[in-house]
Amino acid sequence: MGISMWQLLIVLLIIVLLFGTKKLKNIGGDLGGAVKGFKKAMSDGESEEDKEPKKLSQNESRTIEGSVERNDAKTESKHS
């Protein structure tokens, strides 16, 4: 129960009659320009440094400083 070709043509004809071909051409051009601008902004935001993960050299190591506390105290239970 989809839309047939005739229904699509009728809807397209009504849109052309309402807006006119010149206005539809302008809307299409504006929409295309917006998509191009969005794609360009997305590609400009990604630099080569962001694309590749930072690799540590073989001689480079990381030291994490801190202290560890261990609490082994057992609670005393009262027996009645």
Curated annotation (Swiss-Prot):
GO biological process terms on file: protein transport by the Tat complex
Record-linked Pfam families: TatA_B_E (PF02416)
A cellular component term, taken from the record's GO annotations: TAT protein transport complex
GO MF entries: protein transmembrane transporter activity
Biased composition (Basic and acidic residues): 67-80
Membrane topology: Single-pass membrane protein
Keyword Transmembrane helix: yes
Superkingdom in the source lineage: Bacteria
Stretches for region Disordered: 39-80
PANTHER family registered for this protein in UniProt: SEC-INDEPENDENT PROTEIN TRANSLOCASE PROTEIN TATA (PTHR42982:SF1)
Family designation: Belongs to the TatA/E family.
Subunit structure as annotated in this protein's UniProt entry: The Tat system comprises two distinct complexes: a TatABC complex, containing multiple copies of TatA, TatB and TatC subunits, and a separate TatA complex, containing only TatA subunits. Substrates initially bind to the TatABC complex, which probably triggers association of the separate TatA complex to form the active translocon.
HAMAP family linked: TatA_E
Protein name: Sec-independent protein translocase protein TatA
Species whose genome carries this gene: Hahella chejuensis (strain KCTC 2396)
Lineage, highest ranks first: Bacteria, Pseudomonadati, Pseudomonadota, Gammaproteobacteria, Oceanospirillales
